[in-house]
């Protein structure tokens, strides 16, 4: 605790960010106050603006300032392919590859019964409605490869297949440029089973 209530409040606010503990929050707060007050003002203004204007896209659920995001409005996208991701960060990672030219649906999470996150909370019914509104020929599940991501993919796959949709899952395997001796056994096992 410092001698300033405002400084303590700033440190506590910074601790709300993922991966930021007390020491990191203190370093950030001290840096902004001591060396970069203009940067602190810019950060505060950008945060204020984003909180006031960023919302969910009506079609894909990602973040946007408009009712419908630029990706969903882009006539150059392949509307026959719909890729389901957990977060906008996952969507951004796929976009950076330049390999996917279809559309997205962002779950804004993954199934986690222990945390009270079920099919309703990840928008399963919205996804089903989006995938069945016409034109979608393939739904690609790009949830993360851990227990919750796999469970999420399974539940979504079953629900979409009941609607008669073609559902695929991202392949998993050995990373490009890696050496087998350094790859974990689970990855090697999946690569062997899913070989083509």
From Swiss-Prot:
UniProt-listed Gene3D superfamilies: 3.40.1360.10, RecR Domain 1 (1.10.8.420)
Disulfide bond annotation, renumbered to this chain: none
First and last residues of each zinc finger (C4-type): 57-72
Keywords on record: DNA damage, DNA recombination, DNA repair, Metal-binding, Zinc, Zinc-finger
Annotated GO MF terms: DNA binding; zinc ion binding
Domain of life, per lineage: Bacteria
Biological process according to GO: DNA recombination; DNA repair
Residues annotated as domain Toprim: 80-175
CDD domains: TOPRIM_recR
Sequence similarity: Belongs to the RecR family.
Function: May play a role in DNA repair. It seems to be involved in an RecBC-independent recombinational process of DNA repair. It may act with RecF and RecO.
Protein name: Recombination protein RecR
Biological source species: Verminephrobacter eiseniae (strain EF01-2)
